[in-house]
């Protein structure tokens, strides 16, 4: 029978029992259901149906008839009865029950019991009346048979105590007996099933049966029976039952029909008829069965068959045969539900958690739903009846309803309720799970999910989304069509529920615990309690129960719905558990219930309300309990299913549940909860999870519960301890709490004020305090602050505004400004502006210290500045994390409090899977973090925290080790010297750890800092780094999005830096920012300073007063910072970046230049002395951001300056000597640049200011004139002053410039935005006014020049020295260069100022650009470079000017010279910028060489500053050439030679200078101040080499540029210089036909200042550009010669044009550049000499050129050096000749040609164009350097285009004179950018080629710039790859073209030479 019965089941889809039970039938039936266990088996088989079946199963055995009917209804019963056919179906179905029972005994163990159960379910329904009447022996045997037992088993039954043998417990006992019997027969199966049931029985078998019935009936009265029943039956039954139930449930639907077919309709009808009789007759059996069904209906043996049958019936037969059964089953089902509920509840009570959890989750919910849907009234009444009479309530309809619901075990498994006993057999999948982990994994398997889906399909009437209460609801609404409604929602809900529960359990053990409890035991208890109340009420009346159900349904809030809730509430034990689980939701609902108690908890609970409840109104324990209990019945089951249900998403429900938990606990411990609940608001809008909240708060203590309110981005958090809340609140006061990268607000629900706000306020207060401290410290500058406050309204330049900015964590410029208030602060602030908010704040703290210590702190300020520079790198990350900013701000007060901070070192972090927040959380409990640095690349982290906190943290984690992602963290104290701001120090420490032998001192120049990396951008950056060489090491700071790469060589680092500067790389949306190690610059500066100290008389003075230096630094920083502040503020308006760069130029320049302190001293001294010389007011005045303010506050600024100047004055008193004046000159230069911006911004005001300052400046200049050296330097200063004045008026400019410089410093920041427009106006306005002054100043300059002539070496050295006294701080290699640069910078600064004024818009963009390119050193470096340029140009040019006649050449050539100087300085600045970017490596090398060469440079400076530059490039060649002649040494260095040629040509022949587009521009500039410019260029190149070595690639760039122009684009430095100066000249040259030079300059400036480039581009032709490029491509010598020939030709042409066409124009500018004019005179003299020298060198020293080229090769390491050398031996000679000819002869003609050649070449590949002359040179050099050059060239082109795109357009439009004018503007800008001249010089030289190209084709620049590749200017071919280019260079075609080109160049050189000679 069992098999036949099983076979019918086998037909059922869900008949799992077959598989699990070898007997086949036995597993389904006997699993648990035949016996006491049999019922459980049934409910698994058909959860809904199984429950009813089980009840009938018990009754059916008592009344066989009903059973048969049920059997007929359910084929499973039919099978058992078929096996028991001996009994007539009509025969007392009791008999059938008995025979059945006997058969069940044998087969029931196998499967019949299941079928019997199924039949018995209907029978039970039928039997219920019988039970009511009486039961006979037959009925007893039928009952036994229904449980798969025989009479023999009664003996075992007699062993049970009498008190347990109650009708309610009997099904449980019988199931237990049967399970034991089955376990004996089927040891494997029973043990398996039994274990399973043990695990899931609670949840599955007994729970399922009782679950559904008990939950519906709310029976809690049979706990004892339940206990008895649960122990054995549930386990086996559950296991067996689950499988059979699933299979049965699936099969039952079909078998029901089959059963009907198998059994005569009569049988079924008999059974259906009998049910009433059998039910009444076999009251006990029915009762027992009912009880079992009540308990087991969800899954007991007797009920199992019924379940299967009922399932099938409910699915198929239920409507067919069950239609008749349905009404009875409806009646009986309620009864069976009651009985089952009672029995199960008792069993559960006995089993307690096991059954109760299973039943609560699965059965009760299911039963309730079914019952509610199908037989609400019967169920309700059955409760009363269940207790009073079982039969009447169990109708066939009830049975069908039961059948319509899966068994509780199935439901439990469906809901993924965690079984209480393991191993657990999944009733849906027949898979055994030995552990909870296995069960959780199984829940997530596709098999289980599919089984759940099939279960929903199998029970269409069962809506898994509707919990019992909802079932009632659905019953009311869908009594008629429960299947559809429940069916459609069921899949969704079930999925949600199953997934939700699984997730929950997996998410949090607490939830998990709650869930299982709530699911099985708790639900059972809840249901029991509910059912008790319900049963009571139901017994009272069915309708009330229904009404309750209806109430529950409609409101969906069981809690508020009925008095049962109250009674349930009274039953607290269950409800407390439910409270903990389901109550979580009720917590949401608790408030809701409070607010809307009548509303359904789920519906009523809104996320917002939930949090309100949780946070604000914590319901009393009673209200919570009531709500929870109410919600418990439905809500807890709802917690399972309702969470899945429509009311709330699982997440929301979970949240609600969590909140409920949180509230429950608070309710339990109201005082505790009230104090232990936190409201977390302002959570991330992009989503957050409970885990995120827990992670953030876990460090403070255990978290009892979390309630999420996503709609409001809030969460309620309950901590177990009040102390945790207190510690959290305290922590929040000091540090923001960050969740997923966002600071959140945390407050106690009663307290709405989030503490984060307080925290924010505190940081703001801190900022305020710091701001106030700054203000206090700068009390003298308070007036300025006030003034600047008015101006700060415009640009936020005022410190107060800065403070505000800082408060906002907003504007780096603002913070920089505030920092600027203090000199050291200024520096730090500048860097801070760069770095970002965090670095700014960090700098602030440093600045505060600086304020406290003011000037003495200057040196510390420098260190701080270094830190800030590091911070810059990390600034972005800091900005990214506002907490970091707050921390930084807080650091200041902490520092003020002098709290000892320690660094905690954390190592062994996991590779991935952790966030910075998690590391923060490690330290949060111990105190506020000051800073954190996570080195994800090294799996390490550093946390800066209060020392006490650090100690306790280390001790705690030592005692209680913590692991992260399986890695046990090692937490210890870091060494005391560790500074998180000094990232390089940390990096070097790590390097030493890995490689103790590593030479850390020489490793910094190999560091490349990359900022703004995406989180996953490390690999991309490493790939980028590997393109420039091997990346030896790297350190990735994930929390700062920064990485430091250590490349294999400084050249690689420099190349990468230059490339990334020119071609910013994007990784996703992140634009990488690249910087070099600030220590490299400082080291170079120190070396240069040492050299300067040796060679310069002034440097010793500076060094003699180190205190003064620091003071000077402080004063100079404050003053220079102030101008930069102004610039920065103005720039901040333009762009914070630009302003930051400008400030950094002024402030960071010192920092980089000489550890910031040295260079800062130089700058400070320069500024301070400049302030003295020109009047202290200017510097201070410059501090006020606005010109207006400045003019208004000149007095105030003077006072402020006095404050700052107090230091300055000290220095000045000490440095009263010429050196001081030199320093003043430098400061003037700096100020000039600022003035340029200011003048440009507000010309009229500036003029007034200038006029006000002119006198003092003139006086100062006069004083300077008194000292030759000083006069030289001062002329530089005067020149600088006049440089703007030259545009305006040289003389006025001189005095005004000093004033204007200071004013401009202030104005520049403020007006830099307006600088461009204003510059034009100022130029126009001031040119006139300053012409007179310019003339006077020219005379002075001429005198100075004469003095220089007399003491060229001395003054050069002296100049270099004083400048370096000042510059020493800035750069070591600048010792010679610095002086040259100082003077040249003065000139170039003046020129730059002029250029700036002339092309105000361009100049503005140029300085900002240049500054942006070379952030730190540009302003000062520009000034120095300009000074050097001018000094070199002066000294070298003065020599030449002396030769050519300074006065005449000055007066005549001054316009041209001014343009040239501008161009040169501009070029230099541009080139320096470019070169610093591109050729930092070369610069470094050269700088090192220069360090050794400074004396030579000094000599060369005395001989020729160009020579000094040459010395910078090649000390040997420089020495030889310097001994030969000033010009020869220039030629001795190939680049120098080129520069010399260009400069000489330009100096000698403005027209020649014009001829050479690249160097022609320089030449034009040189014509304006040709020799000085060219010399400056060369010297700049030379100096720029050391300078860049020092940290400013700009100085080294000239030589390097010369060298690397061939080798790399950096050769363009000269071009850049020329371009910078010639951008001014460009405008002039545009007006004049000499714009070719301008083109170069513009191109170079375009690199530096894009606007000028387009103009030049327009002028230069591609052919000329190509020619120039070809020349340059050859080698440094070739390039130098060729460029000189070409450039000189162009320069000569342009210079001539400038002189001719632009002289008038320039003459107007000449007043601006009186010093420049002097420089021009000097340059011209020098250019004459130098040019003569160049010609001599060219003619005499092609060999020298080759030697120079060889030297260049050595320095540049060009592969083509040999080839180039060979070619240059012949080609260079020819080139030299060509250069001479070009310089002399090919002015206009060749100028055009070369412009064409150079321009295309330049635009495409500056570096390549350099190689162009010699294919070998191109191949070797360019192979090495072309990538850099090309990139640099293109990048400069980009810059040209970008910065000067509009000017480039203008270039085409304006006349050549206009171009020259614009060029002069660009030059000024470039000069302003001279801080970056090294890079830009090289770039400019290279980019001058590129720029000439750019000039010719402004549009091409854009295209060429973004596109990487190599362009052969000689062949006009473009190659995308370096190899292709190299191959091309080696090709015969290229060689032939090169030869042709060289031949042309030779001719041009000859022509140029002739022209130059004639021009001389």
Swiss-Prot record:
There is a cross-link at residues 291, 775, 1804 (Glycyl lysine isopeptide (Lys-Gly) (interchain with G-Cter in SUMO2)). Residues 60-75, 117-137, 1442-1459, 1806-1818, 1886-1895 have a biased composition (Polar residues). The modification Asymmetric dimethylarginine is found at residues 47, 49, 54. GO terms for biological process: RNA splicing. Residues 76-89, 468-483, 565-583, 591-602, 755-782, 838-854, 867-879, 888-899, 1082-1092, 1140-1151, 1484-1503, 1518-1527, 1772-1790, 1819-1831, 1870-1885, 1936-1960 have a biased composition (Basic and acidic residues). Residues 484-556 have a biased composition (Basic residues). The modification Phosphoserine is found at residues 128, 288, 298, 367, 381, 418, 554, 606, 615, 637, 1099, 1400, 1635, 1661, 1864. InterPro entries: Matrin/U1-C_Znf_C2H2, Matrin/U1-like-C_Znf_C2H2, Nucleotide-bd_a/b_plait_sf, RBD_domain_sf, RRM_dom, ZNF638_RRM1/2, Znf_C2H2_jaz, Znf_C2H2_sf. Keywords: Activator, DNA-binding, Isopeptide bond, Metal-binding, Methylation, Nucleus, Phosphoprotein, Repeat, Repressor, Transcription, Transcription regulation, Ubl conjugation, Zinc, Zinc-finger. Residues 470-573 are annotated as: Involved in localization to nuclear speckles. Residues 618-628, 783-802, 1399-1409 have a biased composition (Low complexity). A zinc finger (Matrin-type) spans 1876-1906. It is found in: Nucleus speckle. Residues 19-31 have a biased composition (Pro residues). The matrin-type zinc finger domain is required for localization to nuclear speckles. PANTHER family: MATRIN 3/NUCLEAR PROTEIN 220-RELATED. Interacts with FHL2. Interacts with CEBPA, CEBPD and CEBPG. Interacts with MPHOSPH8 and TASOR components of the HUSH complex; leading to recruitment of the HUSH complex. Interacts with SETDB1. Interacts with HDAC1. Interacts with HDAC4. This is Zinc finger protein 638. It comes from Mus musculus (Mouse).
């Amino acid at each position: 029978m069992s098999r036949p019965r099983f076979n019918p089941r086998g037909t059922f889809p869900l008949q799992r029992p077959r598989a699990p039970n070898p007997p086949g039938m036995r597993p389904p039936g006997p699993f648990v259901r035949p016996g006491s266990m049999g019922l459980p088996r049934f409910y698994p088989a058909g959860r809904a149906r199984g429950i009813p079946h089980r009840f009938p199963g018990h009754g059916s055995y008592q009344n066989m008839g009903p059973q048969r009917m049920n059997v007929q209804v359910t084929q499973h019963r039919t099978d058992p009865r078929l096996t028991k056919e001996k009994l007539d179906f009509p025969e007392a179905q009791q008999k059938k029950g008995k025979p059945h029972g006997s058969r069940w005994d044998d087969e029931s163990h196998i499967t019949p019991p299941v079928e019997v159960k199924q039949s018995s379910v209907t029978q039970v329904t039928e039997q219920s009346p019988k039970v009511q009447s009486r039961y006979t022996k037959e009925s007893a045997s039928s009952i036994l048979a229904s449980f798969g037992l025989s009479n023999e088993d009664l003996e075992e039954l007699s062993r049970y105590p009498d008190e347990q043998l109650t009708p309610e417990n009997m099904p449980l006992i019988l199931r237990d007996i049967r399970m034991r019997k089955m376990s004996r027969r089927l040891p494997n199966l029973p043990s398996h099933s039994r274990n399973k049931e043990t695990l899931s029985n609670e949840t599955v078998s007994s729970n399922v049966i009782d679950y559904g019935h008990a939950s519906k009936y709310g029976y809690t009265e049979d706990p004892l029976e339940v206990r008895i029943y649960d122990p054995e039956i549930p386990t086996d039954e559950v296991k067996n039952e689950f499988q059979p139930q699933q299979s049965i449930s699936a099969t039952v639907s079909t078998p029901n029909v089959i059963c009907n077919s198998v059994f005569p309709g009569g049988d079924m009808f008999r059974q259906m008829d009998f049910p009433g009789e059998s039910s009444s007759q076999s009251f006990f059996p029915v009762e027992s069965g009912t009880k079992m069904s009540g308990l087991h209906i969800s899954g007991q043996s007797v009920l199992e068959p019924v379940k299967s049958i009922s399932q099938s019936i409910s699915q198929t037969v239920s409507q067919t045969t069950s239609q008749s059964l349905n009404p009875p089953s409806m009646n009986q089902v309620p009864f069976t539900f009651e009985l089952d509920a009672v029995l199960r509840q008792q069993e559960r009570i006995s089993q307690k958690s096991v059954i109760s959890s299973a039943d609560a989750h699965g059965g009760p919910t299911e039963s309730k739903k079914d019952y509610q849907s199908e037989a609400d009234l019967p169920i309700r009444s059955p409760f009363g009846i269940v207790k009073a009479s079982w039969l009447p309530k169990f109708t066939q309809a009830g049975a069908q309803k039961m059948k319509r619901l899966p068994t509780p075990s199935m439901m439990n498994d469906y809901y993924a309720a965690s079984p209480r006993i393991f191993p657990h057999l999944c009733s849906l999948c027949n898979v055994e799970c030995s552990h909870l982990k296995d069960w959780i994994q199984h829940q997530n398997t596709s098999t289980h999910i599919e089984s759940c889906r099939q279960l929903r399909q199998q029970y269409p009437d069962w809506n898994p989304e509707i919990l019992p209460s909802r079932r009632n609801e659905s019953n009311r609404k869908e009594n008629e069509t429960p299947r559809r409604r429940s069916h459609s929602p069921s899949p969704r809900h079930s999925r949600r529920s199953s997934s939700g529960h699984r997730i929950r359990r997996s998410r949090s053990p607490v939830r998990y615990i709650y869930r299982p409890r709530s699911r099985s035991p708790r639900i059972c208890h809840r249901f029991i309690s509910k059912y008790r109340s319900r049963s009571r009420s139901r017994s009272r009346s069915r309708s009330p129960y229904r009404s309750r159900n209806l109430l529950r349904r409609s409101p969906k809030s069981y809690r508020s719905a009925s008095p049962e809730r109250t009674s349930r509430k009274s039953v607290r034990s269950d409800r407390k558990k439910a409270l903990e689980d389901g109550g979580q939701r009720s917590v949401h609902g608790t408030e809701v219930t409070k607010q809307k108690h009548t509303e359904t908890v789920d519906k009523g609970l809104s996320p917002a309300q939930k949090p309100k409840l949780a946070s604000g109104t914590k319901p009393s324990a009673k209200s919570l309990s009531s709500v929870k209990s109410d919600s418990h019945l439905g809500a807890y089951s709802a917690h399972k299913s309702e969470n899945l249900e429509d009311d709330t998403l699982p997440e929301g429900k979970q949240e609600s549940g969590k909140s409920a938990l949180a509230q429950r606990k608070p309710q339990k411990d109201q005082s505790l909860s009230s104090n232990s609940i936190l409201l977390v608001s302002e959570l991330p809008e992009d989503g957050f999870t409970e885990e995120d909240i827990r992670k953030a708060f876990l460090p403070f203590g255990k978290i009892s519960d979390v309630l999420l309110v996503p709609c409001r981005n809030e969460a309620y958090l309950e901590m177990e301890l009040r102390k945790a809340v207190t510690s959290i609140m305290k922590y929040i006061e000091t540090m923001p709490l960050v969740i997923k990268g966002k600071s959140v607000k945390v407050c106690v629900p009663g307290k709405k004020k989030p503490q984060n706000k307080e925290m924010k306020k505190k940081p703001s207060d801190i900022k305020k305090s710091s701001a106030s401290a700054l203000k206090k410290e700068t009390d003298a500058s308070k007036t300025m602050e006030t003034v600047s406050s008015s101006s700060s309204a415009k640009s936020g330049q005022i410190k107060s505004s800065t403070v505000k900015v800082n408060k906002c964590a907003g504007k780096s410029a603002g913070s920089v400004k505030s920092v600027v208030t203090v000199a050291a602060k200024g520096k730090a602030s500048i860097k801070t502006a760069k770095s970002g908010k965090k670095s700014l704040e960090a700098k602030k703290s440093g600045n505060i210290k600086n304020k406290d210590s003011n000037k003495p702190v200057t040196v510390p300020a420098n260190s701080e500045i270094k830190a800030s520079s590091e911070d810059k790198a990390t600034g972005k990350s800091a900005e990214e994390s506002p907490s970091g900013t707050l921390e930084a701000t807080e650091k200041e007060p902490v520092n003020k409090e002098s709290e000892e901070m320690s660094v905690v070192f954390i190592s062994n972090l996991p590779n991935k899977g952790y966030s910075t927040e998690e590391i923060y959380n490690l330290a949060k409990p111990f105190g506020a973090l000051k800073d954190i640095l996570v080195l994800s690349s090294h799996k390490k982290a550093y946390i800066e925290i209060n020392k006490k906190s650090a100690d306790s943290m280390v001790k705690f984690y030592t005692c209680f080790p913590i692991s992260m992602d399986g890695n046990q963290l090692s937490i210890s104290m870091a060494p005391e010297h560790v500074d998180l701001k000094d990232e390089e120090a940390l990096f070097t420490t790590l390097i030493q750890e890995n490689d103790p032998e590593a030479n850390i001192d020489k490793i910094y120049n190999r560091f490349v800092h990359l900022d703004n990396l995406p989180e996953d951008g490390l690999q991309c950056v490493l790939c980028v780094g590997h393109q420039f060489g091997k990346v030896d090491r790297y350190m990735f700071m994930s929390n700062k999005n920064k990485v430091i790469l250590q490349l294999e060589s400084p050249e690689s680092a420099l190349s990468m830096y230059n490339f990334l500067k020119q071609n910013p790389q994007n990784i996703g949306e992140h634009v990488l920012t690249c910087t070099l190690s600030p220590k490299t610059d400082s080291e170079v500066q120190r070396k240069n300073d040492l050299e300067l100290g040796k060679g310069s008389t002034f440097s010793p003075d500076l060094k003699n007063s180190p205190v003064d230096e620091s003071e000077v630094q402080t004063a100079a920083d404050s003053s220079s910072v102030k101008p930069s502040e102004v610039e920065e503020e103005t720039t901040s308006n333009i762009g914070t970046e630009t302003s930051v760069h400008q400030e950094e130029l002024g402030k960071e320049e010192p920092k980089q230049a000489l550890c910031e302190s040295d260079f800062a001293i130089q700058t400070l001294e320069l500024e301070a002395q400049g302030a003295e010389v020109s009047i202290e007011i200017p510097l201070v005045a410059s501090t006020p951001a606005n010109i207006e303010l400045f003019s208004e506050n000149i007095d105030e600024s003077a006072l402020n300056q006095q404050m700052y100047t107090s230091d300055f004055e000290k220095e000045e008193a000490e440095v009263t000597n010429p050196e001081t004046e030199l320093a003043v000159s430098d400061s003037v230069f700096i100020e000039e640049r600022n003035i340029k911006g200011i003048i440009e911004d507000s010309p009229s005001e500036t003029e007034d200011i200038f006029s006000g300052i002119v006198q003092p400046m003139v006086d100062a200049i006069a004083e300077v004139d008194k000292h030759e050296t000083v006069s030289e330097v001062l002329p530089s200063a005067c020149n600088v002053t006049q440089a703007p004045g030259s545009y305006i008026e040289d003389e006025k400019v001189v005095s005004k410039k000093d004033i204007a410089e200071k004013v401009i410093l202030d104005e520049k920041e403020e007006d830099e935005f307006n600088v461009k427009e204003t510059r034009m106006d100022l130029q126009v306005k001031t040119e006139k006014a300053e012409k007179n002054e310019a003339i006077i100043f020219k005379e002075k300059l001429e005198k100075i020049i004469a003095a220089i002539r007399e003491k060229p070496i001395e003054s050069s050295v002296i100049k270099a020295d004083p400048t370096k006294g000042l510059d020493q701080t800035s750069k070591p290699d600048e010792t010679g260069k610095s002086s040259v640069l100082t003077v040249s910078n003065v000139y170039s600064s003046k020129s730059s100022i002029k250029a700036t004024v002339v092309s105000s818009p361009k100049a503005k963009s140029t300085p900002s650009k240049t500054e942006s390119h070379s952030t730190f050193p540009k302003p000062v470096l520009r000034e120095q470079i300009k000074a050097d340029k001018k000094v070199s140009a002066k000294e070298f040019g003065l020599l030449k000017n002396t030769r050519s006649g300074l006065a005449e050449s000055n007066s005549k050539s001054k316009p041209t010279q001014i343009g040239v100087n501008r161009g040169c300085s501009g070029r230099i600045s541009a080139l320096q910028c470019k070169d610093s970017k591109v050729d930092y490596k070369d610069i470094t090398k050269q700088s090192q060489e220069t360090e050794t060469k400074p004396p030579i440079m000094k000599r060369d400076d005395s001989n020729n500053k160009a020579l000094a530059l040459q010395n910078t490039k090649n000390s040997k060649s420089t020495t030889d050439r310097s001994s030969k002649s000033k010009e020869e040494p220039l030629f001795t260095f190939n680049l120098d030679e080129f520069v010399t040629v260009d400069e000489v040509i330009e100096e000698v022949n403005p027209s020649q200078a014009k001829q050479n587009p690249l160097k022609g521009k320089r030449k034009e500039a040189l014509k304006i101040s040709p020799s000085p410019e060219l010399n400056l260029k060369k010297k700049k190149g030379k100096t720029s080499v050391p300078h860049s070595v020092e940290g400013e690639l700009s100085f080294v760039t000239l030589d390097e540029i010369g060298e690397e122009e061939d080798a790399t684009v950096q050769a363009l430095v000269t071009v850049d210089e020329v371009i910078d100066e010639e951008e001014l000249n460009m405008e002039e040259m545009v007006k004049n036909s000499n714009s070719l030079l301008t083109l170069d300059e513009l191109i170079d400036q375009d690199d530096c200042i894009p606007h000028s480039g387009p103009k030049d581009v327009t002028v230069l032709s591609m052919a000329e550009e190509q020619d120039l490029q070809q020349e340059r491509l050859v080698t440094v010598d070739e390039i130098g010669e060729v460029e000189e020939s070409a450039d000189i030709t162009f320069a000569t042409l342009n210079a001539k044009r400038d002189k001719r066409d632009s002289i008038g124009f320039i003459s107007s500018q000449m007043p601006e550049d009186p010093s420049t004019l002097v420089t021009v005179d000097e340059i011209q003299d020098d250019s004459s000499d130098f040019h003569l020298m160049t010609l001599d060198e060219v003619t005499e020293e092609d060999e020298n050129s080759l030697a120079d080229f060889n030297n260049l090769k050595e320095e540049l390491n060009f592969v083509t050096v040999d080839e180039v050398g060979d070619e240059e031996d012949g080609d260079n000679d020819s080139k030299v000749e060509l250069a001479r000819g070009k310089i002399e002869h090919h002015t206009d003609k060749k100028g055009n040609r070369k412009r064409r050649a150079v321009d295309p070449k330049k635009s495409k590949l500056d570096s390549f164009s350099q190689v162009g002359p010699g294919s070998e040179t191109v191949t070797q050099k360019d192979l090495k350097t072309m990538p850099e050059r090309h990139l640099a060239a293109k990048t400069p082109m980009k810059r040209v285009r970008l910065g000067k795109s509009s000017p480039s357009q203008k270039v085409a439009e304006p006349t050549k004179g206009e171009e020259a004018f614009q060029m002069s503007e660009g030059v000024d800008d470039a000069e302003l950018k001279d801080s970056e001249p090294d890079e830009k010089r090289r770039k400019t030289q290279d980019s001058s080629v590129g720029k000439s190209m750019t000039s010719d084709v402004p549009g091409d620049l854009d295209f060429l710039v973004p596109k990487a590749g190599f362009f052969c200017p000689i062949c006009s071919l473009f190659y995308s790859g370096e190899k292709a280019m190299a191959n091309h260079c080696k090709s015969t075609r290229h060689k032939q073209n090169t030869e042709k080109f060289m031949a042309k160049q030779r001719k041009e050189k000859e022509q140029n030479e002739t022209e130059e000679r004639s021009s001389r």
